[in-house]
Amino acid sequence: MLSRLSILCTLLFGLALSGAGPAKAENVWIAPDMPFFEYTVRGQTYTIERNQDTNATITGSFAKTSRKCPPFCIHPMKAADGVVTVGELELLEFVADYVETDLGLLVDARLSNWYDAGTIPGSVSLPFNLFDPTGNPFFKPVVSRLGGQLKADGNWDFADAKHLLLFCNGPWCDQSPRAIRNLISIGYPAEKLLYYRGGMQSWLMMGLPTIKPSGV
């Protein structure tokens, strides 16, 4: 059975072939049944397609293979027990199933200077340090925004919490794993958290597009 994502991609590709929409991804598709993918988040429509230049390479800081460890050490595949690790296709499916329907958020957990330099289209900036429950004045408002409700006993009720897919710079970056661990420490359901371990480095390595937030 085709997933909702595959069905959407098939429909979009059919529109492009019929002339009802712009032709996309002539040579480099995302997947065999996915030449490109479009989604609308908070009123903005994004087209995700890979760089069509088969000679393209990564440039800039994400082209580096080695960083001092610690602190930039390779992270395990699993950020925490019960948290599913995903790749690029699962990220797009998450956007289709949860972000477009307002049931979830694609969270860029990096500090704002990284976010401002370029992020995955449709993501929101919620830096990892916002999820530190100790001495952070923004902690309660942020968790409330995610659907958490603070109970009279000081614990959180996450029955209506959003599904979150968190990412940072790559397998060597600790920002999204730290955010995930802090969320779990206050009772956020692990089954509502996903971890895109590849992060920005893998996203760029696949030739996928980034955007700079408006006003930057």
Q: Each PLM stretch: what is its role?
A:
Residues M1-L5:
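Positively charged n-region of N-terminal signal peptides that target proteins for export
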Residues A117-P121, F138, S176-I180, M206-G207:
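Short, solvent-exposed loop/turn and secondary-structure capping segments
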Residues L111-Y115, L130-P133, G170-D174, G199-W203:
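Solvent-exposed loop/turn segments at secondary-structure junctions
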Residues V95-K162:
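Mid-length scaffold segments of soluble, non-membrane domains
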Residues S6-S18:
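Bacterial N-terminal signal peptides
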Residues M206-V216:
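Active-site neighborhoods of enzymes that stabilize oxyanions during catalysis
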Residues A23-A117, V216:
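Flexible, polar/low-complexity N-terminal or interdomain linker segments that lie immediately upstream
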Residues L146-Q201:
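Catalytic cysteine-centered active loop of the rhodanese-like fold, especially the PTP/DSP P-loop
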